Every structure is written in C-alpha cells, then in structure tokens.
From Swiss-Prot:
This is Pantothenate synthetase. Beta-alanine binds at residue 56. Pathway: Cofactor biosynthesis; (R)-pantothenate biosynthesis; (R)-pantothenate from (R)-pantoate and beta-alanine: step 1/1. HAMAP family: PanC (MF_00158).
Length: 276
C-alpha cells in the first residue's frame, strides 16, 4: 500500500479506471473495514482517504478532539489490502482562498441532522465532491449508519452528474446492538452499557410494525424504550420515508426509524429499516 498526502502525488498514483473509493475521517473500526472489504471485492484498485473535515463541524462540536491515529489506520488498511491511502492536510484539501461550497437543498438537508447541526451537510457535500473530483472513482462506499449522509451524497451525485456509483453498506454493530462509531471511544464504561438504548428503541418500533401496529403506536414504543435511560437526551426519534426522509403517518415499504441524541460524553445516531 502506498500513502500520499498531496493532490499531485494522488493524481500520479491513480490508475485510469477501476477505482473503488472509501472516504473516511479515520480512527477506523470494523464498520470502516466492512466498506473496504466490499470495495476490495468489487474493484481492481481501492483508495481510502483519511481526512477530518473541518467544514462539517459546527461551533462547539468536537473537531479538535475528534480521535486521530494515522499510523494505526495505516496498519489496518495495509492488512485489509488497500492499494492507496490519501491522507491530506487541511491546507491541501482547502488551499488558501478556497471559497466554494456545495449545498444540497430541501428536506434531505433541512431535517433531522441538518436541523440539529446547521451547515453540516454543506461541509459533507463539499468535501465529498472535492474528493470525487480528485480520486475519480467508479464506485464509492458509505455506511448506512449515517443514512441521511448517504442520501445526501446520492442526491448530489445525481444532480451534478458525477459518474460514480454510490454504494450503501449495512451498519456494523457490537454484540449488544450499538452501532460502531469512532465517537464511541468518548463513552465512559457506565455510559457504554446504556448506549444500545438507541438500537433498542429502533427494534421496539420494528416489533410494533411487524405485529401490525400503526406508525403512531411504533413511535410510542420507541419513546418508551428511550425513557428507560434518562441520561440520554433525545434530539429526535422518527419514522421516515426511506428516500425523502419526510416523516410518515402511514407505513410505506422500507420505512426507516431514525434516532439521535446525547449522552454526557458524546452524541450518537442510529437508524434501522422498521417496515419491510
């Protein structure tokens, strides 16, 4: 595996076609490696980027303390069979005078994470667009754990005509259901035991749906599950359309349960298909 940190080195190292791309912010875990494994199976050449993107963090968020360990990441990617690691600095990605932003409009970015974290998806769309232009992948891999982000990237790709297939990969979970996240490292041992409450709320909603209950009944079951852990401060719990993310009052195929909120040490999000 080769590691490069500049745009010039990246361009010199890329093949002309057959690139599968996994953009990350580093501090890799099994969820990231599932993306890499899928990319490795489906593409002759695999590129991974590690870049903690300042544009997607708001004031008071965890940009400066976001976990970083490039040497550990490099070892994991080498073992996973990655061909090229692109690990640029901020100045390389956003040179002095960089003034362009990419904005996906509408409910996809206005609701849920977009409402709680203003400007977040503009930062995501900007960095992903720049990375796509630099790496020129045929396929790019994103985890379903960040489901709203996946839909935003797909919309940007459709609207701007990027010749990239955006592949969603199912969420990887711990044995107790907690979705893997680099931010889980923030959790104290006591909070870690309580963190699967997000997944339990989603399962409760799916169970009600499976028994023929209404959307309203499913939401009540999810809320009840969350109340069992008073330390968790909910930002939102909803059942939404799987493509528009608009809240539902009646079931549709693929309806998605989404949940987010804060523990004292960290903010967590999760989602699950609750109606097949």
């Amino acid at each position: 595996m080769r590691t490069v940190s500049t745009v010039a080195e990246l361009r010199a190292a890329l093949p002309r076609e057959g690139v599968g791309f996994v953009p990350t912010m580093g501090y890799l875990h099994r969820g990231h490696l599932a993306l890499v494994e899928r990319a490795r199976r489906e593409n002759p050449f695999v590129v991974v980027s590690v870049f903690v993107n300042p544009l997607q963090f708001g004031p008071g968020e965890d940009y400066h303390r976001y976990p970083r360990d490039l040497e550990r990441d490099r070892a994991l990617l080498q073992e996973a069979g990655v061909d090229l690691l692109f690990a640029p600095g901020v100045e390389e990605m956003y040179p002095e005078g960089f003034a362009t932003r990419v904005q996906v409009e509408g409910p996809l970015t206005a609701l849920w994470e977009g409402a709680v974290r203003p400007g977040h998806f503009q930062g995501v769309a900007t960095v992903v667009a720049r990375l796509f232009l630099l790496v020129q992948p045929q396929r790019a891999y994103f985890g379903e754990k960040d489901y709203q982000q996946l839909l935003v990237v797909r919309r940007m790709v459709r609207d701007l005509g990027f010749p990239v297939e955006v592949v969603g990969v199912p969420t990887v979970r711990e044995e107790d259901g907690l979705a893997l996240s680099s931010r889980n490292v923030y959790l104290s041992p006591e909070t870690r035991k309580k963190a699967p409450v997000l997944y339990r709320a989603l399962l409760a909603m799916r169970e009600v749906a499976g028994q023929g209950g209404s959307v309203a009944e499913a939401l009540r079951a999810g809320e009840e599950a969350l109340r069992a852990v008073p330390e968790f401060r909910k930002d939102y719990l909803a059942i939404v359309h799987p493509e528009t993310l608009l809240p539902l009052s009646d079931w549709v195929a693929g309806a998605r349960g989404i949940v987010a909120g804060r523990f004292p040490e960290a903010r967590l999000i999760d989602n699950l298909e609750v109606y097949p």
